């Protein structure tokens, strides 16, 4: 899944020889792909260059005009909204995500066909010949229930476990059987009615 937003626009980071009056405006392009988010700073001219490259190869919406009203902040906000709608329009109109757009968004490992199977795309990231391997986490099991039979060397009985067992099964455990010294033997359960 690919989501693209342009949340803000602001002046480009100033270089040592650059005056604040001549700074260019940079659009902060926020990309969310497979749960990972990154930001790409792009100037209007870079958006326009992308448009020139892909307009004959793919379906693209109208590109936002460079001419804006004299009100600088309102015009920048209109341009930001227009560029965001333009990028989202490219994603919506095309069945495959254009390679040029992926480069523009700095995405390397993204399936260009959004209808591609997730399993097929995951295989390229797994090491070696993993098509027949199944990956799962190790399973932890206990031979003896650690809550019923605690092989602790403590001399004091476990009052909580004894109380729960007595309340649930209506039998009592003597302190000697509750905390065995060497081997752990589970408490006997009452016979089934």
Curated annotation (Swiss-Prot):
Gene3D superfamilies from the UniProt entry: Phox-like domain
Keywords recorded for this protein, A-Z: Cytoplasmic vesicle, Lipid-binding, Membrane, Protein transport, Transport
GO molecular function, one term: phosphatidylinositol phosphate binding
GO BP terms, alphabetized: protein transport
Entry GO terms, CC: cytoplasmic vesicle membrane
Membrane topology label: Peripheral membrane protein
Residue ranges of the region described as Disordered: 1-21
Pfam families reported for this sequence: PX (PF00787)
Tissues where this protein is expressed: Expressed in erythrocytes (at protein level).
Record: residues binding a 1,2-diacyl-sn-glycero-3-phospho-(1D-myo-inositol-3-phosphate): 43, 45, 66, 79
CDD domains for this protein: PX_SNX22 (cd06880)
Location relative to the cell: Cytoplasmic vesicle membrane
Chain ranges of the PX domain: 1-118
Primary residence: membrane
PANTHER family found in the cross-reference section: SORTING NEXIN-22, SORTING NEXIN-22 AND 24
Annotated family: Belongs to the sorting nexin family.
Domain observations: The PX domain mediates specific binding to membranes enriched in phosphatidylinositol 3-phosphate (PtdIns(P3)).
Functional note: May be involved in several stages of intracellular trafficking. Interacts with membranes containing phosphatidylinositol 3-phosphate (PtdIns(3P)).
Quaternary structure and interacting proteins, as annotated: (Microbial infection) Interacts with P.falciparum (strain 3D7) CK1.
Protein name: Sorting nexin-22
Natural source organism: Homo sapiens
């Amino acid at each position: 899944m690919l989501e693209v937003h342009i949340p803000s626009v602001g002046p480009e980071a100033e270089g040592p020889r650059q005056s604040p009056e001549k700074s260019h405006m940079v659009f902060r392009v926020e990309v969310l792909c497979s749960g990972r988010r990154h930001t790409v700073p792009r100037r209007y001219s870079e958006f326009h260059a992308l448009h020139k490259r892909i307009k004959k190869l793919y379906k693209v919406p109208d590109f936002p005009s460079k001419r804006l009203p004299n009100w600088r902040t309102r015009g920048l906000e209109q341009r930001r909204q227009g560029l965001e709608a333009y990028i989202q329009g490219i994603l919506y109109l095309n069945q495959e995500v254009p390679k040029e757009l992926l480069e523009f968004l700095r995405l390397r490992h993204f399936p260009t066909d959004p209808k591609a199977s997730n399993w097929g795309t995951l295989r390229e990231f797994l090491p070696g010949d993993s098509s027949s391997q199944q990956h799962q986490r190790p399973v932890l099991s206990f031979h003896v229930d650690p809550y019923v039979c605690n092989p602790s060397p403590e001399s004091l009985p476990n009052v909580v476990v004894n109380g729960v067992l007595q309340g649930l099964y209506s039998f009592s455990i003597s302190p000697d059987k509750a905390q065995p010294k060497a081997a752990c033997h589970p408490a006997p359960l009452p016979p089934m009615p």
